[in-house]
Structures are given as C-alpha cells and as structure tokens.
Design a protein with these regions (language model features):
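Register position in tetratricopeptide repeats
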Residues: 61-62, 95-96, 129-130, 146, ...
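Alpha-helical segment of the N-proximal tetratricopeptide repeat
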Residues: 45-84, 88-98, 125, 129, ...
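Helix-start (N-cap) detector for alpha-helical repeat units in TPR-like alpha-solenoids
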Residues: 42, 49, 83-84, 117-118, ...
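Terminal, low-structured helical/coil segments at or just beyond the last alpha-helical repeat
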Residues: 31-43, 244-296
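TPR/TPR-like (Sel1-like) alpha-helical repeat modules
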Residues: 209, 213, 219, 223-254, ...
Length: 296
C-alpha cells in the first residue's frame, strides 16, 4: 500500500501543520488581488502576504487547490523569508501531483527552518514520488531525528526501504510505526507485502489477517489474503474473500493499480492468476458494468 487514508503513501504531514499555522476556523474568501501599495511598506507587505497565505490555507481545507496555489505563490513573493508560507506552497504542489515543482519551495522552507520535521517529511514524500529513494530516506530520517514518534513518517520510510529491496529495514520501520500506533493497519499490511516477497507466505497471511481485524472495510489486505490463500490451496475462502474485497473497491482488480500500491513481483504474479479465475472474472465484470440511472 502506498498512499492510504493516512498516506500508503503518504501522509502529507506538512499541509495540516500549515493549515493550523494560518488558522482556518472562520473561512472568508476575500479578493485575491493584492491591493496597490504606493510606497513599499515592509510591514504592510508582510500583512498582505500572510493574509494571502491564510486564504490559501482556507481554500486548501475545502480542496480548492488550484485557487490555493495562486495565493500561496503570491504570498511567497510578499513574505519570502517565511518558512511556513514556502511549506504551504510545496505541500499544495504535492496535493495536485506536481511533485517536481514541490521540491524547490520545500527546500526553501527547510533552509529557513531546519527544526520543522513536517517540512522534511513532505520532502521525503516528494522525493519518493519522483523515485529518488536515497533522497527520500535522507529527508525522512532527518525529520525523524527531530520527531521520532511520527508513525506516518516511519511508514513512508518503510516504503522507501521497500522500494530499494531493503526488506529488513522496511519491516523494522513499519514495526516502529505500529508500536506507536497499534491500529495503524497500513503498516501491518505492508509488512505482509514484504514478507510475501521474501517467500514467507504464512507470515504474510498473519499480517493481513491482523490488518483486517483492525479495519474490515479495507480492500487491500483482504485481496492480498485471498491471493495468498489461493496459492496455498484454500480455494473456497480465497474466492469468498476475494469477491468481498473487490466489491469494496474494484480498482484493486487492475494490476497497474496494485503496482502503484507497492505490490511486489511475487504477489503480482499470483494475483494475475487469481484474477483470471472464472468466479473472480465474473465478479469484476458485474462490478464494472454501468449502473442504471434512477428514473426521473
């Protein structure tokens, strides 16, 4: 899993912090244009820049990211020495998938405030998405030295290790995340992914069952469990579990989607076989049919 409700992927830790910094309790959307200033008054410019940043944070809270980006970009011009404003801009780029564009503002934010772990965690996210895993690991480990008890960052670090096939380090990082938050099912799920790639099918099954026990509404551990059970010869439970999983979210019937969620080669090979089973193919066919529109 990559980006789960908490980020199999990523938990964008910087954006919530930016929102809290600028305050979003009473959202009011003023005009975006910066008032004309006859004389450059530094205090006035700073006030305007922070106001724009606050508006940007408010818009981001309502997922209006493109509008938020415009304001954040203007804010960095008016208050170029404010690390929170740069962090906000970088986090917004991440939210809209402009991962390369996020690097420069996050680096600027980090140069202005080297003690804020959320900036480093966001940098780790950006580097991971760009497949720059060494840089991702460096940023995440530096952030964790400042805030070692952040399960989302430990999870992201585990993902980066996993992509480098540093399986022991990946499991250790996931386990630390679970020690801090024992119901953090994405980390438990990903321990299963690693164990499966190492050939420990029984261990993977145990992890996926544990993840399901925490949150039975999640598709990924259920489908992974179904695939593993099928490989072990437990056909009926495999089919029942797999059908139930796909009914929760049929995107998991797409191998490309599974690759995005960090499923490894061994599990993908078994999943390809599983998805070709007649009952599973029929289930997916039904789920992918257009739903009839209610009569007016």
């Amino acid at each position: 899993m990559l980006d789960r409700p908490v980020s199999k992927r990523f938990s964008l830790l910087v954006l919530p912090i930016a929102l809290s910094i600028f305050g979003v309790a009473q959202p009011t959307f003023a005009q975006v244009l910066v008032p004309h200033v006859p004389q450059l008054d530094p205090a006035r410019l700073e006030e305007q820049g922070l106001s724009l940043a606050q508006e940007s944070a408010q818009l981001a809270q309502f997922q209006q990211y493109e509008l938020a980006l415009v304001r954040a970009q203007l804010a960095t011009q008016l208050v170029p020495e404010n690390p929170q404003v740069w962090a906000l801009l970088g986090s917004l780029y991440l939210q809209v998938g402009q991962d390369q564009a996020a690097i420069a503002p996050l680096q600027k934010a980090q140069s202005l405030d080297r003690e804020e772990p959320a900036i480093l965690f966001a940098l780790g996210t950006a580097y991971f998405r760009l497949k720059q895993y060494d840089q991702s690991i460096d940023a995440l480990r530096t952030g964790l030295r400042l805030k070692p008890d952040e399960p989302g960052a430990l999870f992201d670090l585990g993902n980066a290790y996993y992509m480098q096939k540093r399986y022991g380090d990946a499991i250790a990082s996931y386990q630390k995340a679970v020690e801090i938050s024992d119901e953090f099912w994405p980390a438990i799920n990903n321990i299963g992914l690693v164990l499966y790639e190492q050939g420990d099918v029984d261990g993977a099954v145990e992890q996926w069952r544990a993840a399901i026990a925490i949150d039975g509404t999640q598709t990924e551990p259920q489908l992974a469990l179904a695939v593993a059970l099928h490989a072990q010869g437990d056909q009926e439970e495999a089919l029942t579990t797999g059908e139930a999983a796909l009914r929760l979210d049929n995107r998991y019937g797409d191998l490309d989607f599974l690759v995005e969620n960090l499923w490894g080669d061994r599990l993908l090979a078994q999943t390809r076989t599983f998805l070709q089973l007649p009952r599973i193919r029929e289930t997916l066919s039904q789920l992918r049919q257009p739903q009839p529109q209610p009569e007016q």
